[in-house]
Design a protein with these regions (language model features):
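Extracellular ligand-binding interfaces
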Residues: 337-370
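Extracellular beta-strand ligand-recognition surfaces/modules
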Residues: 105-110, 226, 284, 377-411
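Extra-cytoplasmic beta-strand recognition segments
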Residues: 12, 89-97, 284, 315-347, ...
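Extracellular carbohydrate recognition and processing domains
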Residues: 133, 358-387
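Aromatic (Trp/Tyr/Phe) and Gly/Pro-enriched flexible surface segments
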Residues: 263-318, 404, 408
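GH16 jelly-roll
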Residues: 1-268
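Conserved aromatic beta-strand anchor motif in extracellular beta-sandwich/beta-rich domains
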Residues: 194-196, 349-355, 409
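Beta-strand-rich interaction surfaces with strong enrichment in secreted/lumenal proteins
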Residues: 77-84, 160-168, 204-205, 309-311, ...
Length: 412
C-alpha cells in the first residue's frame, strides 16, 4: 500500500482562484485557436449547483466548433492548469464531458524542460482523453516517459477503453475519471492504472514518468480528425464538479509545469449555468458563402436583422443538420418557433435516427400550419441500439412556405 504524502482537493466552492489555477490562454497543436480565459466560467450559486447534481461549485469550460459564426473563435477551447506540481498518486476528476465531436476533452499532467535530444529531455505526462476514433463509446489513457516530437522521440504507452455496450461518455451524466501513478519500482509497483467510475479500464507498465508535473483539465482541438471527429457544432460546454490528487510518497524527481500567467475566470453569479444547445445556427442568423451555416439543403435563406433573424423556407423544401455521436437511450427536448406559415400544408421539424448514412427511424414531428404557429416543444428518446447520430430535419409540404426561428435542442 502506498504512503499518502498529502491531498489536493478542489470543489470550486470558492470559484476559480487564480492563486491556485492558471486560466489558460495557451495554444498547442496545429489548426486551432488555442484556449481562452473568455471560455472559463464558474458558479457557486448553491441552488443552481445542487440542481445540477454537484457540490461546492461548478467550473464551466466552453468550446467553439466550426459552426461558430466568428471564424476567429473556431476550434478554441478552455483549460485550467494547477500552479502547484504533483508527483505519483491518484488523480481524480468528476466531470461531464463536452458532448460534441471534433474536440478532445482531457484530464492530464504535463511537464517538459524543452530538451531536444534524448540526453537532455526531461518530460512527464499522463493523459485521459475522449472521444477516440470519432466515438464517445471510446476513451484512452496514455503514459509518457519521454517525448520530443513524433519523429525524434515518443516513449509512451496508450490503452484504450472500447465500451460499445455502455451508454456513451457524453450521456449528460457526471462520471469520475481517475488514474493512479506509481513509481515504487523497488517494491514492484511502477505503472499507471486508469479508472472510470471506480472500474479499472487499463494499465501501463512501460514508459512511466519520473518527474513532478502540473495538472490540467479542459478541452482543445487536435488536428487529427480520425482521432476526434469533425467539430461540426457552434458552441458546447464541459463541467467539472471536483478534482482530487492524493499524492504518494513514491520516488520522484522535481519537474515543473505550473506558470505565473494570470487571467480571471468569469463568475456567473446568479445567472443560470449555460447548457448545451445541440442545434447550431438555430436562429438562422449566420450565412457563409451564400448558404446557411450548419444547415444542408436548398430553398432556405436568412431573413430579418439583429436578434430577430429567422429562416425563410420555400415550398416543398428541406434543410437538415447532423448531430453526431448520439446514442440509444439519449432523451432530448426539441423546440422551435414558427412566425408565419403560408399555404394549406404543414411545416414539420423532427429528428432522424441515423446509423452512418442509413436512417434507422425518426421521432414524432413538431407541426405548424397557417392557423397554428408560435413556439412548440417535442420530447423524444433514441430507441435503436445501432444509432450513432441524429439528423434534424426542417421541411415544408408542397405549396406551403414557412418562417421559422429559435430551433433548440437540449439533452434531458
Amino acid at each position: 500500500e502506498p504512503t499518502i504524502k498529502g491531498t489536493f482537493y478542489e470543489d470550486f466552492s470558492n470559484g476559480i482562484d487564480s492563486d491556485i489555477w492558471e486560466v489558460s490562454s495557451q495554444k498547442w497543436g496545429a489548426d486551432n485557436n488555442g484556449t481562452s480565459p473568455d471560455n472559463v466560467f464558474y458558479s457557486t450559486d448553491e441552488t443552481r449547483v445542487k440542481n445540477a447534481g454537484a457540490t461546492g461549485g461548478i467550473a464551466v469550460l466552453r468550446s467553439y466548433g466550426d459552426l461558430q459564426a466568428n471564424s476567429a473563435k473556431r476550434r478554441q477551447g478552455a483549460a485550467l492548469i494547477t500552479r502547484q506540481t504533483f508527483g505519483p498518486g491518484k488523480y481524480e476528476v468528476r466531470m461531464k464531458v463536452l458532448p460534441r465531436l471534433g474536440q478532445c476533452t482531457a484530464f492530464w499532467t504535463y511537464y517538459s524542460n524543452g530538451g531536444q535530444t534524448p540526453e537532455t529531455i526531461k518530460y512527464s505526462e499522463i493523459d485521459i482523453e475522449m472521444p477516440m476514433e470519432g466515438s464517445f463509446k471510446k476513451w484512452s489513457g496514455t503514459s509518457y516517459e519521454r517525448f520530443i516530437d513524433w519523429n525524434i522521440l515518443a516513449d509512451r504507452q496508450t490503452v484504450m477503453a472500447d465500451e460499445p455496450e455502455k451508454g456513451g461518455l457524453n450521456d449528460g451524466q457526471w462520471h469520475t475519471y481517475a488514474f493512479e501513478w506509481r513509481t515504487d519500482a523497488a517494491n514492484g509497483d511502477r505503472g499507471v492504472i486508469w479508472y472510470r467510475d471506480g472500474e479499472k479500464m487499463g494499465e501501463a507498465r512501460e514508459f512511466v514518468p519520473n518527474y513532478k508535473a502540473a495538472l490540467w483539465v479542459g478541452n482543445w482541438f487536435p488536428p487529427d480528425k480520425s482521432w476526434v471527429g469533425i467539430p461540426d457544432f457552434e458552441e458546447a460546454y464541459m463541467y467539472v464538479d471536483w478534482i482530487r490528487v492524493t499524492e504518494y510518497d513514491d520516488p520522484v524527481q522535481e519537474g515543473g509545469g505550473g506558470s505565473t500567467a494570470r487571467a480571471e475566470a468569469t463568475d456567473l453569479g446568479t445567472k443560470p449555468i449555460p447548457q448545451n444547445d445541440y442545434i447550431s445556427n438555430g436562429k438562422f442568423s449566420s450565412m457563409e458563402n451564400g448558404v446557411l451555416l450548419g444547415w444542408e439543403g436548398e430553398g432556405g435563406t436568412s431573413s430579418g436583422s439583429g436578434s430577430d433573424t429567422y429562416l425563410n423556407l420555400e415550398a416543398g423544401k428541406k434543410l437538415t443538420q447532423m448531430i453526431r455521436a448520439q446514442y440509444s437511450g439519449y432523451s432530448f427536448t426539441l423546440s422551435a418557433e414558427a412566425l408565419k406559415i403560408v399555404g394549406s400544408g404543414k411545416c414539420k421539424i423532427y429528428a432522424e435516427y441515423m446509423f452512418g448514412s442509413v436512417r434507422m427511424g425518426k421521432s414524432e414531428a413538431i407541426e405548424f400550419t397557417a392557423s397554428d404557429t408560435g413556439k412548440k416543444n417535442l420530447n423524444f428518446t433514441i430507441d435503436n441500439n445501432r444509432v450513432t447520430d441524429l439528423r434534424i430535419v426542417v421541411e415544408t409540404e408542397e405549396g406551403t412556405t414557412a418562417q421559422v426561428t429559435n430551433i433548440e435542442m437540449f439533452l434531458n
